[in-house]
Amino acid sequence: MSTALGTELRPALPRDQWNTTEMGRFLEKIENTYGVHFENYDQAWAWSVANLDDFWQQIWDHFEIISHAPHTAVLGSRTMPGAQWFPGARINFAEHIHRALVEHADVPILINRSQTTGSSEWTGQQLLDEIAALRTGLIAQGIGEGDRVVGYLPNIPQTVALYFATASLGAIWCSVPPEMGPQSVLDRIEQLDPSLIVAIDGYKWGAKSISRADELDRIRAALPAMKAVVLPYLDAECEIPAGALSYAEFTKNTAPMEFVPVAFEYPLVILFSSGTTGKPKAIVHCHGGLLLEHYKDISLQFDITDRDRTFWYSTTGWMVWTLSVSSLLVGAAMVLMDGDPGWPALDGEWSQWAVLAETKSTYLTTGSAYLAVCAHSGLTPGKTWDLSRLREIQCSGSPLAADVAGWVYAEVGPDLMLAPASGGTDICSGFVCGSPLSPVNAGEMAVRPLGAAVYSWGPDGQEVSGEPGELVCVAPLPSMPAFFWGDENFDRYTASYFDTWPGIWRHGDWLIHTERNTWAITGRSDATLNRGGVRLGTAEFYAILDPRPELKDSLVLHFEDPDGGMGVLALLAVANGELDKEATEKALKTFIRTELSPRHVPDVIIWVPSVPRTATGKRLEIPLKRLVQGINTGNTIDRGVLVHPEDLDGIVAALKAVLA
């Protein structure tokens, strides 16, 4: 399996066939309205960023946004941070979901595949009924506008319904996946002072049953004012904890649906950053921002319609989950899977390919790392399963290697639209992605999304090509965060994105603009780790490792694997004397898995005499990583600032040996 970087795997759609796609039809409206003509996607992109007000007004009109009051402008202010979108409008995200479900009331809309409870299907009407019952239950518990509702739930229909029920009230949704340990959960939701949590009792991961009862008890003990509802999932007869409601009791009544109109910028959902420099940042996304951005993504960039059956493999803690349920905006059916896709084997009945075939799905979103594992394992999905209905694969979470892209076309389907993408929790969307109009080149991403003024900049703030630069966005996007929870003065917000160039969003990814006018992400330019698309902050590791008596110090690094894998390495220094390193490593991995999540478990533990720190105590993660990689970015280590400079060469040698 060998495919050269940049090899064209799928040609651009001929111009006279654009009207076979949702994007093509939308762009024809633009051409007719403004008297312009686009020969290719890049010309359309250039128009969209040069005419932001007109472009986003056309998105608003094209998708018939329901507003209970007129807006007075498209962009009242372009200042970043703080851009003011559609001032005066009064909308509700959930009302648009409701409209689509009413139009698809009698067809299967959620196709559920769970290793815990088996298979089920919900029609649009069943989902509407569940949303109404949950909304009634929330009201009965005193939940209203501005309250925070937490779901400690897997990717199942009830989670989807709870999100939209919460949104309908003007309450704020927050999801933490059940594989997260109690400390990871509390690091996130304690910031929010949530009013209510809905949690499962446990779940199955492959053949293993995992209870969440003790974890929920610990979470509730830390937040005694928070009300709790338990959904029996692992055990239908599970005991409901004292002071909590059963899901059945919570949803026993139903009242007619209503929607609280809110301002465009009003909070809809809180997603969490990785926690690189402390507790994870609580990133607030607004009703209007996600509504417009997700309509654009789902319909135009992804070319999804109500004729599609979409399968997004995602944990509920990933921003992809929040994006995935927005496919309901256009009436597309969703396949929900909760379980281990590698059980009982990579080519077994729970393989993502098997689920795709069995559910007759037309669209897949998965992790690039999953595609890499399948490719390197010699799987031939197109021969093993009937994937004749599959027409598109989106992948994200890490760069997709050229060889793996070639494998997709050779072994999955020769006519697919393969669309690697990269964006983030920060915008709950993409900065570079695919397009149904554009060619597919191995190891690269095709385009910048319409309306996204994305560039690669060098240190001098000028565009660069053919080499890594900082991914920047020089104009507002509707889905940029409204604010960070608890960051009243925008201090953390500004420091996160605007500390390098005032008024310019710096995302923290290295981005290459290629000679083919395509795009490639080569890794993070900050200390955030990336495990299969879920960004993990080093501060989360240190919060639980620092108190360990057997450890003197620790440092966690991430190295991108060019073949699509991800390597998380932990450098550990022993506190006193000798210890059984094999047993300690096993115990520490179990501890990390329990307290944080399986994604946090390091691939390799390296024992070192010390970790690189300055005299002020700062861990030198990025400088050490750059030194090992041989990258001269001006951040290589000045030995004079190190507490133990004599240990540095040995640490670098140990890292290089592991990475060799």
Model region roles, listed by residue range:
Residues 42-47, 94, 110-164, 181-186, ...:
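Conserved AMP-binding/adenylate-forming core of the ANL superfamily
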Residues 300, 391-518, 525-528, 541:
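Conserved AMP-binding/adenylate-forming
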